[in-house]
Amino acid sequence: MARRRRRHRGPRRPRPPGPTGAVPTAQSQVTSTPNSEPVVRSAPAAAPPPPPAGGPPPSCSLLLRQWLQVPESASDDDDDDDWPDSPPPEPAPEARPTAAAPRPRSPPPGAGPGGGADPSHPPSRPFRLPPRLALRLRVTAEHLARLRLRRAGGEGAPEPPATPATPATPATPATPATPARVRFSPHVRVRHLVVWASAARLARRGSWARERADRARFRRRVAEAEAVIGPCLGPKARARALARGAGPANSV
């Protein structure tokens, strides 16, 4: 297997160093001289701009300058023109409208420039309540009117005629005011309530009724048992039982 021969390269030609701080920039010029390397001639570096008054120090990086907040001096006034949403400046005292001078009234949206109707704006429709709300308000108003009539002198009674107002006499301590009397309405309403008899009966009954029925049933059953067993436990029945036991024994 043949080995590959490595090519021998001679020593590299050293590159002459350029001037210190020569960096090709937009203001630099590249010139070449015969039998020599190109030389970069850069313009003198411009001095950095002085930091603004009250701004961040020049040692801060660009990122820190964007996020660093330096308090402004109290003498600087904010310019309202820099803010688009700022309110308009207040007018001068002589330009302010006075109370005597009438303010110009803006025409309604449906009026034209001459005061007539503007065909571009349709006339506004009158406000109308929904049907259900109107019905509810009407029923409520009628109910309140009936309540007023009932409180005044009974339901269905005609309203008393309006009497001219008489001057009120001042009450003296010698004549005490008459106490108010209770007036009953001459119109009486009777409302019949229809209920199920079984539901009313069950409502009248309760746990006490069930316990009373159980006690009565227990007494009745005890009396029936005493009527059957009572004669067997009397003195005569005991004597007969003892005489039967004292007799001759039963033969097997």
UniProtKB/Swiss-Prot annotation:
Which regions are annotated as sequence repeats? Answer: 162-164, 165-167, 168-170, 171-173, 174-176, 177-179
Q: Residues annotated as region Disordered?
A: 1-129, 150-179
| Residue segments, region Important for interferon resistance | 194-252
Q: Which cellular component appears as one GO term in the record?
A: host cell cytoplasm
Q: Which InterPro entries does the record associate with it? A: PPP1R15
What does the record give under GO molecular function? protein serine/threonine phosphatase inhibitor activity
Please list where the region (Binding to PP1CA) is annotated. Answer: 179-192
GO biological process entries: response to endoplasmic reticulum stress; symbiont-mediated suppression of host autophagy; symbiont-mediated suppression of host innate immune response; symbiont-mediated suppression of host translation initiation; symbiont-mediated suppression of host type I interferon-mediated signaling pathway
Question: What spans are recorded as compositionally biased (Pro residues)?
Answer: 46-59, 85-94, 120-129
Stretches the record annotates as Interaction with host EIF2S1/EIF-2ALPHA: 222-237
Q: Where is this region: Required for nucleolar localization?
A: 1-17
Please state where this protein is localized.
Answer: Host cytoplasm; Host nucleus; Host nucleus, Host nucleolus; Virion
The family assignment reads:
Belongs to the PPP1R15 family.
The identity of this protein, by name, is Neurovirulence factor ICP34.5
